Curated annotation (Swiss-Prot):
Protein name, UniProt field: ATPase ASNA1 homolog
Binding site for ATP: 48-55, 248, 275
Assembly mode: Homodimer.
HAMAP family the record matches: Asna1_Get3 (MF_03112)
Active site: 77
SUPFAM superfamilies cross-referenced by the UniProt entry: P-loop containing nucleoside triphosphate hydrolases
Organism, scientific name: Plasmodium chabaudi chabaudi
GO cellular component: GET complex
Family, similarity comment: Belongs to the arsA ATPase family.
GO molecular function list: ATP binding; ATP hydrolysis activity
Amino acid sequence: MSKAGSDASSISCSLSLDSDSCDDEFYETNLNKLIENTSLNWIFVGGKGGVGKTTTSCSIAIQLAKKRESVLLLSTDPAHNTSDAFNQKFTNKPTLINSFDNLYCMEIDTTFSEDTAFKINKSDFLNSIIPELLQSFPGIDEALCFAELMQSIRNMKYSVIVFDTAPTGHTLRLLAFPDLLKKALGYLINLKEKLKGTLNMLQSLTSNEMEFEGMYDKINHLNTMSISIQENFQNPLKTTFVCVCIPEFLSVYETERLIQELTKKNISCYNIVVNQVVFPLTSQDANIESCEGLLKQIKDTNIKDSFSSLILKAKELEDVYISRRKLQSKYLTQIKNLYGNYFHIVCMPQLKSEIRGLDKIASFSEMLLQSKDIPIYSPQ
């Protein structure tokens, strides 16, 4: 985290939906601004594995369904936890979520597929040489699949799409695909001009009537599509990213890395959801009557030793609770100092049970709209 302080200064109000709104009132500690923003088409939810991305994306989708005509929750995480979250099986086709008439879910695989990659022409010869030409662009196979996927998504008639993404590394790779496509397809287009004579000669010598112009028409189409996707990514009126983390070192570090990459790619990000936060048992930590104090009262009044033993066990639990609060407060303070002036930071409480099933997700989603102070430990 040594770069945290210097990197924080690079994050400006340009990350927010409304660059003219940089006052404290705008950065409320809830997601109301996100839900009420009817111009958004794509909302990406991402972060480190195991921090509650799926729960958060499902909750956001539920709230959006109350405001928008039609909502699609799209899982690009290979683990596909959305089915488990809703206790309902989803596939690669949009499926209506139980109890809703405008909220759909689908689970897709964004990894490389032999069935779709490089099939830009019916010619077997061309399909064999294109991969060779693109060997200098590692990951182009996945990028082409991603381009086809995003084109399909753009053709879907939903008011807004919520992306439940894979862990940070995979997500950053996915967001880099438009740049990779632009470079690779630009390379092929330039290659056409350099090798135009050779390609024409090959076409005249072969018997399978290769349609080189048709091939480059497809390449130009892919290039135009990739540019359009990139423009959509970088339009804060249409696309935004919600970062999800927990108040622990690795998660906060990955969140910082993710926000830096989003900033470099000019992708809007103005919301951070911090899950599994231990809140004080009362409005202030100092108001908690400690087990140590109770134990002193017991000793003063000569109550039986067996009851004293129970209080000692409770004291151990109290120590764990306070230690957890102190540890989380360290990272909550870092989050507040780094992003408090530019982001909606929403702290969600550690709950007693797993958030599975529509009712529990719906309850969690309501909490995303409720403002809560960042619970920094302060015993005095």
